[in-house]
Amino acid sequence: MNIMNKRFCILLFTLLMVVAVKAQPMLSIEEAVAATLKSNFDIQLLKNDSAGYALNNSYAKAAFWPRVNATTGAVFNHNNQNQKLADGTKRKANNIRSGNINTSVNLNWLVFDGFKMFVTKVKLAEYVKLGDLTIKNQVVNSIAAVINSYYRIVKEKQQLKSIEEQMGINEERVKQAEKKLSVGLGAKPELLQAKLDLNAQKANKLIQQTLIEQVKEDLNQLLGFAQGTLYEVADSIPINKNIIVADVMGTAENSNTDLLVAKQNIQLAQLTLKEKKADRYPTVSLVSAYNFSRANNHSVINPFTPLFSQNYGFNYGISVNIPVFNNYNVKRQIQTAQLDLNYQQLLYNYKKFSTGIAISKAYKNYELQKNCIGAQQAGFNHHFRIERNPKEPGRCL
């Protein structure tokens, strides 16, 4: 009875495992791309950076506005005074109390700074464009990584299928070798070799299954899925056989997001250089203030000291700051900005050159693989027939 219960439990567990495997949802390439656009951490981080650029740009006009600051303060004194004048007169008083209140409102309006504020406003707008381009670039890279990882799983599944088919052939060879040996028509080394080949394929199957699980975990990370998420992928890789290299080369400069980001960095470096050159010019500011002060002395020892004093009023004027010598700091900053501009231009040219080389190499590999598909399929079918039928011509026994 116990044996029957154990067998029943084993059978039930096996059925549940089979159902669980078959119940894994199908993940299409479109769903994988949609998932990475929604949950990919790299894209989310760059969106946060782009939001920061947009926030800074929304306050860009503030550079043209005046600055207004208010200050106030109150001081109360309790002093003991002892004075001796030149004529010999002595004055002395204790616990002399006084109070002072000061309040001011100051305005400073920068009206000219070598047009630096205008350049900065444009620069902030260009940073918003850079943020959008970096997001697009990351989206393209993330989608490419997802597609590569997804179809690598498909490729490894096809490899696993080939291994399983080879295992079936090896199992058939083992059976045939056992039959031939049992009737005295075969040799034991042939049987041993067939078993060795079968065991080798079993080991290859385990290795391949592990590799598929590892690649799936890589895809889970790209998609933002939880570790161990189960799903199935497609069984084939679609191939576009109508790609023309001239079309790809012609649109790369204006559509390749990596090149567009590099070009935008050149624009920002040029604006930074203009900002630094503006520091050579004087700055002109309009200034104004409203001041209020009040002093209250409860007692004095000098008869000419007022017991109460109050002043208030409005003033205005203009302030000019002319840079004369600042230890060559502006010159150094201009040279640094020029070096950065040169670097960004070289980087763009390098990326443009590298992109052209990468497109050329990828297209050559694409042409090679496209030409090899038919030959590989024919060779595989021929090999499969030979393995199925050992007596077919071309089989070496």
What are these model-derived regions, one by one?
Residues M1-A35, K84-D87, Q209-D247:
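Terminal intrinsically disordered/low-complexity segments used for targeting and assembly
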Residues L55, N141-E253, N365, Q369:
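Periplasmic alpha-helical coiled-coil/stalk elements that build and connect Gram-negative outer-membrane
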Residues A23-G73, N79, A187, Q227-Q270, ...:
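Bacterial Sec-pathway N-terminal export signals of envelope proteins
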Residues N56, A63, A70, N77, ...:
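Soluble, cytosolic/nucleoplasmic coiled-coil alpha-helices used as oligomeric scaffolds and tethers
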Residues T71-W109, A234-K241, K274, V287-I322:
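Small/polar, glycine/serine/threonine/aspartate-rich low-complexity segments that form flexible
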Residues L45-A60, Q138, S142-K161, V215, ...:
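Amphipathic alpha-helical coiled-coil segments
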Residues A32, S39, L46, L110, ...:
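Amphipathic alpha-helical coiled-coil segments and their boundaries
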Residues A34-Q44, A51-R67, S104-V122, L133-V140, ...:
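A glycine-/polar-enriched beta->alpha junction
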